Regions:
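Histidine-dependent nucleotide/RNA phosphoesterase domain, centered on the 2H-phosphoesterase fold
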Residues: 1-184
Length: 184
């Protein structure tokens, strides 16, 4: 099964993000926008994982994060990963709490590499993906094509989740496989 590990957001934060993006979503249907319920910060993409290996990954999550405290983050500016100067991925950066998120990702990276998962070559950038360029769209965007004003409150991240991702023609469906609650 296709899996990834991520930080889950409170529903009210997802809703606030979507309200802020509403006009851009209407104005730019050429982009593939992430659905509201699927908003998250990926810590580690695992790819295809044999079913029998999934419980061991859940056990590792428990081992790494059980007893950790919930932490506060604040999302920042809308930014883009580019390909030849054009927007490939549109994302929201982390203004506060990014160091803690990096620490979580690094701990996962170290632990999961011992289980045979490939280490990421690129440096981890904590971010929330909000849209991707469609491969076959004729419309291309530059970073300054976006005017998104975010005014989101700080919020607590209190769970780290192992997700199963099922790809469908209408978009991915995420299912929680394992949830590790962070303490108050």
């Amino acid at each position: 099964m296709r899996c990834f590990i991520a930080l889950e957001f409170p529903p009210e934060i997802k809703s606030s993000i979507y309200k802020s993006l509403k006009q851009e979503i209407q104005d730019k249907p050429e982009l593939k926008w992430v659905s509201e319920e699927n908003l998250h910060i990926t810590l580690k993409f695992l790819g295809e994982v044999p079913d029998k290996k999934v419980p061991a990954i859940g056990d590792q999550l428990e081992k790494i994060f059980k007893g950790d405290k919930k932490f506060k983050i604040k999302l920042g500016e809308v930014q883009a990963f580019l390909n030849r100067g054009e927007v490939r991925v549109l994302w929201i950066g982390v203004e506060k709490g990014g160091d803690k998120i990096k620490k979580c990702a690094n701990e996962l990276e170290k632990s999961l590499s011992k289980m045979g998962f490939k280490k990421e070559k690129r440096e981890f950038v904590p971010h929330l993906t909000i849209a991707r360029a469609r491969k076959y769209s004729k419309k291309r965007f530059k970073p300054n094509d976006f005017d998104i004003e975010l005014n989101l409150p700080d919020f607590y991240v209190d769970e780290i989740v192992l997700f199963k991702s099922t790809l469908t023609p209408s978009g991915p469906i995420y299912e929680k496989i394992k949830v590790v609650k962070l303490n108050g």
